[in-house]
């Protein structure tokens, strides 16, 4: 299940981040790619293990932690890896699947957080493959798209301008995407019921089911 998560970052936070990135040191994106992904990865990434990178990563993590939709839909145990990527003209990231394990943790959910507006560049769509179709995403600044890390995906070539994104990986409390979707649907339903009717018997039963499924499936 794919989730568009709007307004992860405020306009003020976006401006601060993009200004910082303008002056920051970027390195070859191949340095963080798996052995076969290096063959199709052509972008630049913010140098890791610098005070600038650590401060920006913490800012994004805090924004995700306070985002209700991200927390409910993804059930993050930890956001274990964050990268800031830049694509200029001619850059792209070909078809690949993300590594299953990163920094000793499982990658259940991948996300791309768009840092500049679609009008700032041409091309650069994130394309995620399904069983018999593809979905393309080029979203407003501050919006994230989250999707199962099991998915084949690519970034189309940027033909004009600069594409800025933060990409990250999550180990979820619930590793299976279908199970996460079931819990999410029940959680949304109980919250909607509570907003309409308050604390009813039906709300209590749905809340019990959400809690018990979390007990059953969390790891």
From Swiss-Prot:
Keywords noted in UniProt: Dioxygenase, Iron, Metal-binding, Oxidoreductase, Vitamin C
Textual note on the cofactor: Binds 1 Fe(2+) ion per subunit.
Entry's transmembrane regions: none
Binding site for Fe cation: 96, 98, 153
SMART domains, A to Z: P4Hc
Organism (species): Picosynechococcus sp. (strain ATCC 27264 / PCC 7002 / PR-6)
NCBIfam families assigned: PRK05467.1-3 (NF003974), PRK05467.1-4 (NF003975)
Gene3D superfamilies for this protein: q2cbj1_9rhob like domain, Rabenosyn, Rab binding domain
Protein known as: PKHD-type hydroxylase SYNPCC7002_A2658
Primary enzyme class: oxidoreductase
GO biological process, one term: intracellular iron ion homeostasis
């Amino acid at each position: 299940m794919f989730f568009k998560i709007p307004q992860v970052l405020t306009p003020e936070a976006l401006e601060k981040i993009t200004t910082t990135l303008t002056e920051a040191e970027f390195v070859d994106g191949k340095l963080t790619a798996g052995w076969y992904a290096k063959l199709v990865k052509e972008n630049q990434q913010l140098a890791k293990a610098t005070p600038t990178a650590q401060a920006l990563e913490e800012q994004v993590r805090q924004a995700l932690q306070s985002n209700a939709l991200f927390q409910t839909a993804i059930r993050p145990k930890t956001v274990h890896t964050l990268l800031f990527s830049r694509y200029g003209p001619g850059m792209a990231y070909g078809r690949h699947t993300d590594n299953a394990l990163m920094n000793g943790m499982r990658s259940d959910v991948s996300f791309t957080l768009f840092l500049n507006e679609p009008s700032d560049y041409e091309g650069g769509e994130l394309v995620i493959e399904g069983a018999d179709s593809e979905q393309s995403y080029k979203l407003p600044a501050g919006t994230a798209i989250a999707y199962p890390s099991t998915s084949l995906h690519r970034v189309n070539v940027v033909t004009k301008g600069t594409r800025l994104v933060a990409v990250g990986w999550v180990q979820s409390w619930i590793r299976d995407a279908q199970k996460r979707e079931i819990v999410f649907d029940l959680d949304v339903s109980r919250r909607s019921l509570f907003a309409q009717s308050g604390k009813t018997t039906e709300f209590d039963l749905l809340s019990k089911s959400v809690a018990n499924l979390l007990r059953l499936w969390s790891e």
